[in-house]
A protein has these predicted regions:
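Eukaryotic intrinsically disordered, low-complexity segments enriched for acidic and Ser/Thr/Pro residues
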Residues: 36-138, 215, 242-249, 269-400
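Short coil/linker segments at helix-helix boundaries
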Residues: 127-132, 137-138, 157-195, 200-213, ...
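Short, solvent-exposed, charged loop/turn and helix-capping segments
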Residues: 198-210, 267-281
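Alpha-helical scaffold segments of alpha-solenoid architecture
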Residues: 214-273, 277-278
Length: 400
C-alpha cells in the first residue's frame, strides 16, 4: 500500500493543482453525509520499533545471577520483537504492556546493566529518514523503560489505525468505533505526554548528542502527543458527519483537529536539530492531516454560509479550502489511502465551488470577499488519558 518514496520537505507547500472535474451527482449540504466515503486514516509511524535480541558471549551454567536475570529479561523483551507485524494488534499491545511491567520491576535487580557492564540492550529506530532502521543502545534501565513505553504507546496508535481503516472499509466508524478509536489514540497521547514530561528529561544528560534515537527525545514525544490527539479529534469529526451534525459544528471540530496537527508540524520544523532526520511518512502525514482538516473546516463553513444564502462567502471559503488541498497534494501521494481521500476531498471542494459560482452568476450577484469570513472558533473535544505507571507484581526470576 506504500507508494514510491520521494524527497519531500514539509516546510514548503507544494504547488500541485487540484482536479476540478465535475462530479456526477450533486454534492452540497444535503448530500455530504451520503457521498463522503473517505477520511484521513492515521498510521502507526513507529510501526517497526523493536528491541533487538541481547547477544551473549558464552552460554553456561556458571553465569552469575545477574546474567541469569538479564537472560530472563531478554526473553521478555524478545516477545515484543514481532509485535508490529502481528496480525492481531491487541496481541502486540499485551506483549509490550507485559514488558513495561517487567522492565520497571527489574530496576535494582540488574545494576550491571545500569552501570554499562555486560551486554548492551539495543532498539531499532523507525522514525528517521532512510530506508533502513538504525540501531541504538538503551542508556541503562531508564532508557530501556523509555523505549518500551514508546513501543507500548505505538501499539495503541496501531490499534487506532487498524480499527479506523477496518470500520471505514465497512462504511463508517459508528458510535462504538469512534469511541474505541478515539480512546486508543488518547491513551497513546497520555503515554507520550508522560514520556515528554516525566521520563525523558532526566535521561537527556546521559545521552550521546550524536547518537540519540528519535524516540528518546522529549520533542519527538511532544510531536507524537499532538498527532495522537489529532487522530482522536479526527474520529470525532467523522462521527459528527455520520450523525448529520450541523455544518458549523463540523467546521469547529475540523478546525480543532487542524490546529493540533499544525502545532505538531511546528515542532517538527523548529526542533529539527534534535533528531537524526525524520521519516518522510511522519512529516508528510502531519502535513496532509493538517491541511485536509483545514480544507474540511472551510468546506463545512461554506456549507453553513450557503444555507444562509451568503453565496459570496461560500465562494471565498471554497477558495481557502482549495488552497489547503493544494498545499498537501504532493505529500498525500506517500500513502494510497491518503491519495484516495485527497482526491475525494478535492472533488467535493471543486463541486461546491462550481455550484456556488453558478448560483452567484445567475441568482445572487454578491461580491466575493477576500479572504472571507473567518472560521468559527475551534472545538477540541479530546484530551490525553493520563498514564499512571502500574505497580508490577514480583516475578520469580527477579527474586532472591
Amino acid at each position: 500500500r506504500v507508494a514510491v518514496r520521494r524527497k519531500f520537505d514539509a516546510s514548503r507547500a507544494p504547488s500541485d493543482a487540484i482536479s476540478r472535474r465535475a462530479p456526477r451527482r450533486r454534492v452540497g449540504p444535503s448530500r455530504a453525509r451520503a457521498t463522503t466515503r473517505e477520511m484521513f486514516l492515521p498510521i502507526d509511524y513507529a510501526r517497526a520499533l523493536t528491541p533487538e535480541a541481547i547477544e551473549f558471549v558464552a552460554d553456561g551454567a556458571a553465569d552469575s545471577l545477574a546474567f541469569q536475570r538479564l537472560r530472563a529479561l531478554n526473553a521478555a523483551r524478545a516477545s515484543c520483537a514481532h509485535a508490529a507485524a502481528h496480525a492481531d494488534a491487541d496481541v502486540g499491545r499485551r506483549k509490550y504492556e507485559r514488558y513495561v511491567d517487567v522492565i520497571t520491576e527489574a530496576e535494582g535487580a540488574l545494576e550491571a546493566l545500569d552501570r554499562g557492564e555486560g551486554p548492551t540492550a539495543r532498539w531499532a529506530s523507525t522514525l528517521e529518514s532512510g530506508r533502513e532502521a538504525r540501531s541504538y543502545p538503551a542508556p541503562g534501565l531508564a532508557g530501556e523503560r523509555a523505549f518500551a513505553l514508546f513501543g507500548l504507546a505505538s501499539c495503541h496508535r496501531r490499534l487506532c489505525a487498524r480499527e479506523t481503516a477496518a470500520r471505514m472499509a465497512e462504511g463508517g466508524l459508528g458510535d462504538a468505533g469512534a469511541a474505541s478509536c478515539s480512546k486508543n489514540a488518547r491513551v497513546a497521547a497520555g503515554m507520550f505526554k508522560h514520556l515528554q514530561e516525566t521520563v525523558l528529561p532526566p535521561l537527556k544528560a546521559s545521552l550521546d548528542g550524536e547518537c540519540v534515537a528519535n524516540e528518546l527525545t522529549a520533542s519527538m514525544a511532544e510531536v507524537m502527543t499532538l498527532i495522537s490527539l489529532g487522530d482522536a479529534q479526527g474520529a470525532a469529526c467523522r462521527r459528527a458527519l455520520e450523525r448529520g451534525s450541523a455544518a458549523n459544528l463540523r467546521a469547529r471540530l475540523h478546525r480543532g483537529a487542524s490546529e493540533l496537527y499544525r502545532d505538531a508540524n511546528a515542532v517538527l520544523q523548529s526542533r529539527r536539530c534534535d533528531w537524526n532526520g525524520v521519516d518522510i511518512f511522519l512529516t508528510a502525514g502531519v502535513l496532509v492531516a493538517w491541511k485536509t482538516h483545514e480544507a474540511e473546516a472551510f468546506l463545512a463553513h461554506a456549507e453553513a454560509r450557503r444555507a444562509a444564502d451568503e453565496c459570496g462567502e461560500v465562494i471565498a471559503a471554497c477558495r481557502r479550502a482549495e488552497e489547503a488541498v493544494r498545499d498537501c497534494a504532493q505529500a498525500s501521494g506517500e500513502i494510497v489511502s491518503w491519495a484516495t481521500y485527497h482526491g475525494e476531498l478535492a472533488s467535493r471542494v471543486a463541486a461546491l465551488a462550481a455550484k456556488a459560482v453558478k448560483e452567484n452568476e445567475v441568482v445572487f450577484f454578491q461580491k466575493i470577499p477576500s479572504p472571507g469570513a473567518p472560521l468559527p472558533e475551534a472545538a477540541v473535544v479530546v484530551g490525553p488519558i493520563e498514564y499512571v505507571p502500574s505497580e508490577p507484581s514480583k516475578h520469580t526470576f527477579f527474586q532472591g
